[in-house]
Amino acid sequence: MNVLVINAGSSSLKYQLLNPATGALLAKGLCERIGIDGKFTYKPQLEGKEAIKAADVAMPTHNEAIAAVLNALVDEKNGVIGSMKEIDAVGHRVVHGGEKFAKSVVITDEVMAAIEECNPLAPLHNPANIIGIKACQQLMPGVPMVAVFDTAFHQTMPPVAYTYAIPYEYYENDKVRRYGFHGTSHKYVASRAADMLGKPIESLKLISCHLGNGSSVTAVDGGKSVETSMGFTPLAGLPMGTRAGDIDAGILEYLMNKYGYSIGEMLNILNKKSGVLALSDGVSSDFRDLEEGAEKGNERCALAREKFAYEVKKLIGAYAAVMGGVDAIIFTAGVGENDALERMRIASGLEYMGVKMDEDANNVRGEERVISATDSKVKVLLIPTNEELMIAMDTASLVG
């Protein structure tokens, strides 16, 4: 079975063609600058097939982008499948499912209407996701489509975790609550952790640290999300590449009054000009640049790295308390998978809860392995995330 995985943005579209049963990747690529001057990238994973890198392809809409993807996949010379009939289903990443979706679903007219009702909760993402779905429906009639939601995994959180301490009417009338994000990633690595530990996921207490330009930590108890650091939006929680994370709301009023910022300007600062970029005094939002700066004696770069590790460590301690213990801590995503120094910073000081790192095992990038010492009571795991494979697996389970 082959599943085409689509992640549609407002002017871009990422795609992968996978076999969810074996995990085999047949092809992947990217459509960029849709609606502007289209750039198309195609990377077949079969031997002897030639890639296409940032080629000029007219893509006035997402329909042309999807058409370019399909044409490349079935191309007589460099395609990876013989015909469109070999695409059994399409899995779509959808950012926000609100409270309507606690799991992935086959897309119907009713599902599309419900996704559109969630647009106000993710105005930058959901409308683009919907455009991608509609383009595929037009070009691939009869092929089953599945929506996989970033928020769905966290719908198992109890009210004590998701309810904000503001007038309850805002939850009842406006659905203001903690939703959490990166759910597909947290779900995937939690499943892999159970496999690595050789234990049923129902018996495990896991803390998943998805650390990248966007970062979140999730407590997974018995395979279910019970707490997570992102909130109503992906702006909450940890300081990230350019996002502030948790901040005293009174600061916003203070700065808006003092400098005359509009709400839009204030949100732009919090989303685009904060996080480790701000902590490093504008040096970079990239942790590699921050480490280089810190090594050269830049105290602000050092502060940015230390602050990030400090906040992750706080969440690990808090989530262990929420679950009454922890069996394993997982590091994943760009920073989590590739930054051995930051992993050590985070783990340092967690010895009291039974964490004991193996420095040699930790000195690796992007390789699935145990990075704690053999006698560590709490295991520490490095697990590269694979959201596309998780989407393909969910899709196959629903339509297979």
Residue positions per predicted region:
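Extreme N-terminal starter segment of soluble prokaryotic enzymes
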Residues: 1-4
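Short glycine-rich, Thr/Ser-proximal phosphate-binding strand/loop in the N-terminal lobe
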Residues: 12-59
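Short beta-strand-loop/turn "lid" adjacent to the catalytic site in phosphate-handling enzymes
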Residues: 73-125, 152-161
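Short glycine-rich phosphate-binding loop at a beta-alpha junction
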Residues: 82-95, 144-146, 324-334
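Glycine-rich phosphate-binding loop of actin/hexokinase-like ATP-binding domains
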Residues: 153-257
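Catalytic phosphate/nucleotide-handling subdomain of diverse soluble enzymes
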Residues: 221, 226-262, 268, 333-364
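A mobile "lid/hinge" subdomain adjacent to the ATP/sugar-phosphate binding pocket shared
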Residues: 259-304
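Internal helix-turn-beta structural module
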Residues: 302, 306-322, 326-327, 336-400
